[in-house]
Amino acid sequence: LTAKLGYPITDDLDIYTRLGGMVWRADAKNNEGFKDHDTGVSPVFAGGVEYAITPEIATRLEYQWTNNIGDANTVGGRPDNGLLSVGVSYRFGQQEEAAPVVVAPAPAPEVQTKHFTLKSDVLFNFNKATLKPEGQQALDQMYSQLSNLDPKDGSVVVLGFTDRIGSDAYNQGLSEKRAQSVVDYLISKGIPSDKISARGMGESNPVTGNTCDNVKARAALIDCLAPDRRVEIEVKGI
């Protein structure tokens, strides 16, 4: 029985020593037919090199020396024993663990923003911020579209715009009231209040440009500037 102590030289090559003891039995017989035997324990010393061919299979070269086998009084001698050996060993349970499968993270979904535009003349009477019945019907259709988009993690922004008739301050206030009227109605239909907000844009960002600059009559100017009077709805995070 021996204990093995090893030291790695490279990843595949080790040197080692074994120290321990060996239980032996020695038998002797002389020319006259006299027989005798002896048993005992002797120290064992060994050293060698071991090379791993694969993680499971290794070959080794070893020299083992055993001190004082036998008893001169019984078997007629007390020799030492030296043994040079070459061997192959198989080590169980050395299979390499499979490398963990690295799963690439799923790409983040692309955040999109949808834009919708409603004519204020459909939603409101001129210079008013209270929804008309036909305006409510238009928003019912809009709510159905928003529900189909299902912006669970997104938000809805309602932007109110006016034309340039009137003062800047008045138009700013009117655009805010109109945007808020749309927000309140959509909340009543089921959009969470923390997912929707109103913003008044006043007479900014007109879509008519200078096409109405030469229109002087008030009624004709109101008709010409109708595209500027609008409500835009932005749905973010779809």
UniProtKB/Swiss-Prot annotation:
The keyword Transmembrane applies. Gene3D superfamilies: 2.40.160.20, OmpA-like domain. One of its GO terms (molecular function) is porin activity. Residues 104-109 are annotated as: 3 X 2 AA tandem repeats of A-P. The record marks 60 as: Part of salt bridge gating mechanism. It comes from Citrobacter freundii. Monomer and homodimer. The extracellular loops are most variable in sequence, and in some bacteria confer sensitivity to phage and/or colicins. Disulfide bonds join 212-224. Sequence repeats lie at residues 104-105, 106-107, 108-109. The chain crosses the membrane at residues 1-8, 13-21, 43-52, 57-64, 83-91. Residues 111-238 form the OmpA-like domain. It is found in: Cell outer membrane. GO terms for cellular component: cell outer membrane; pore complex. This is Outer membrane protein A. With TolR probably plays a role in maintaining the position of the peptidoglycan cell wall in the periplasm. Acts as a porin with low permeability that allows slow penetration of small solutes; an internal gate slows down solute passage. PROSITE patterns: OMPA_1, OMPA_2. It is a multi-pass membrane protein.
